[in-house]
Swiss-Prot record:
Keywords: Membrane, NAD, NADP, Plastoquinone, Quinone, Thylakoid, Translocase, Transport. The keyword tRNA processing does not apply. It is found in: Cellular thylakoid membrane. It is an enzyme of class 7 (translocase). This is NAD(P)H-quinone oxidoreductase subunit O. Belongs to the complex I NdhO subunit family. It catalyses: a plastoquinone + NADH + (n+1) H(+)(in) = a plastoquinol + NAD(+) + n H(+)(out); a plastoquinone + NADPH + (n+1) H(+)(in) = a plastoquinol + NADP(+) + n H(+)(out). NDH-1 shuttles electrons from an unknown electron donor, via FMN and iron-sulfur (Fe-S) centers, to quinones in the respiratory and/or the photosynthetic chain. The immediate electron acceptor for the enzyme in this species is believed to be plastoquinone. Couples the redox reaction to proton translocation, and thus conserves the redox energy in a proton gradient. Cyanobacterial NDH-1 also plays a role in inorganic carbon-concentration. It comes from Trichormus variabilis (strain ATCC 29413 / PCC 7937). NDH-1 can be composed of about 15 different subunits; different subcomplexes with different compositions have been identified which probably have different functions.
Amino acid sequence: MPVKKGEMVRAIREKLENSVEATASDTRFPAYLFETKGEVVDIKGDYALVMFGQVPTPNIWLRLDQIESF
């Protein structure tokens, strides 16, 4: 089932750590990406903009296959 705008999601560790995006940045991803709820605030093509509200952090673009419903 595809992820929709406004849905609560979390990142899938295995897919994010082994992605092309991970090779371009620091691979020490913070735990909140995998353990807390994030809200999908926008979707463009294969990417979703996710806002994690538990901690004061910037929104992050993740591929749709790197997130799952929480």
